[in-house]
């Protein structure tokens, strides 16, 4: 049974659903115009929806804004600079790091300056092929700051898959790392990167390599050490972007065919994701949110990086696995230690935990009093796993559905 407190909170979340839903479909322009007032605009849009050429709709087409400004600078400007933006928790390397919004702004603006020094400008494409480390988030935001279009590829992805994305994007540079870590093994990125460039018809100008502490890669002539890359860079300001300019390219998972490159526009992306943090996930700016995914997938883009940072809350960046780093209690340890309010993950994670610890012995070791909601998506959530999670956690377990193509929930029991 779900505890009464959790059930009551779920009921309160759902109470306003019908009214909100009716407003959204009966007068979509007024609905989204009101919501759009919650983000920063250099120039507020005078036209909310252009439906002259269906199905190619345009939202906020004469508005101008910037993704990075809304994710970082705005919170510093509003006096929230000392608030924790990112909690990096890496059980696989036994390390943690907390980054405030002010620190994030400094790192991102300098990295963006380094990109500018390399000749990267608005509209250029940049591939990010990195593990789950803070530098990967800095790279994403650095691109967004100057209007470059990032294409994040899951770290350690096969060389032929990376090569196809190099050719598709015509990337100017690739941002990568010396390696990624899996339980019991190190995945060297350099050989994969080198092979991908050999396979690709398009050749990037440079590769910027972040050297992990315990594994250094040998660099070649077209490769630059990450720290050298940023050493003499000066911070740069955000570039004013049209709402229909492109934020990023991301590929579908390939579950229904050949992976497809999805291009995301800027304005609607910011407006929608910020709105979802409170209205679907019930997260407030003072809360800690955790999406246990990877930045190489849409869940990582939307709900590790952009959504929580647009909302000004704290997001957990997790480099590990549900089991094996070191055990099936790592999720409970992170929720307890960082006072996570809501967790978003895939059913596979809970199936793995259930298999390793069916009676929840690890769960019993931790205080999860901060924890209020579990959200599942990405694949079918089988009834046995749902019931097991509800019985163990005694909080609402909400299965919702969306796609890479949409970037946020299509169907959610909120």
What spans do the regions from the language model cover?
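Conserved structural elements of the adenylate-forming
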Residues: 108-109, 231, 262-282
């Amino acid at each position: 049974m779900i505890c009464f407190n959790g059930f009551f909170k779920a009921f309160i979340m759902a109470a306003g659903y019908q009214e909100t839903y009716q407003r959204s479909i009966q007068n979509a322009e007024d609905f989204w115009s009101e919501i759009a007032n919650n983000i920063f605009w250099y120039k507020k849009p005078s036209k909310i929806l252009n439906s002259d050429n269906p199905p190619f709709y345009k939202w906020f087409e004469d508005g101008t804004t910037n993704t990075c400004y809304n994710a970082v600078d705005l919170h510093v400007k509003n006096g929230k600079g000392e608030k924790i933006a990112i909690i990096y928790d890496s059980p696989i390397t036994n390390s943690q790091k907390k980054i405030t919004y002010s620190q994030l702004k400094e790192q991102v603006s300098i990295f963006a300056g380094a990109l500018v020094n390399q000749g990267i400008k608005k509209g250029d494409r940049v591939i990010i092929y990195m593990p789950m480390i803070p530098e990967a988030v800095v790279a994403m935001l650095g691109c967004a700051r100057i209007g470059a279009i990032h294409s994040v590829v899951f770290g350690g992805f096969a060389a032929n898959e990376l090569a196809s994305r190099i050719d598709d994007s015509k990337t100017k540079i690739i941002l990568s790392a010396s390696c990624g870590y899996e339980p019991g093994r190190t995945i060297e990125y350099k050989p994969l990167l080198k092979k991908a460039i050999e396979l690709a018809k398009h050749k990037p100008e440079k590769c910027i390599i972040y050297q992990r502490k315990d594994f250094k890669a040998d660099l070649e002539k077209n490769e630059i050490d990450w720290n050298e890359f940023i050493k003499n860079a000066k911070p740069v300001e955000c570039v004013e972007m049209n709402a229909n300019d492109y934020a990023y390219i991301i590929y579908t998972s390939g579950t229904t065919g050949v992976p497809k490159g999805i291009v995301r526009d800027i304005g609607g992306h910011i407006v929608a994701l910020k709105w979802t943090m409170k209205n679907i996930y019930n997260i407030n700016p003072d809360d800690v949110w955790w999406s246990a995914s990877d930045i190489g997938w849409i869940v990582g883009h939307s709900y590790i990086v952009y959504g929580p940072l647009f909302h000004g809350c704290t997001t957990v960046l997790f480099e590990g696995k549900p089991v094996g780093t070191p055990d099936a209690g790592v999720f409970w340890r992170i929720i307890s230690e960082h006072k996570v309010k809501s967790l978003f993950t895939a059913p596979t994670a809970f199936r793995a935990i259930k298999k390793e610890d069916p009676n929840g012995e690890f769960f019993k070791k931790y205080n999860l009093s901060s924890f209020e909601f579990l959200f599942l998506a990405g694949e079918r959530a089988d009834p046995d796993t749902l019931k097991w999670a509800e019985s163990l956690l005694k909080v609402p377990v909400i299965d919702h559905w969306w796609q890479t193509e949409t970037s946020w929930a299509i169907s959610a029991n909120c």
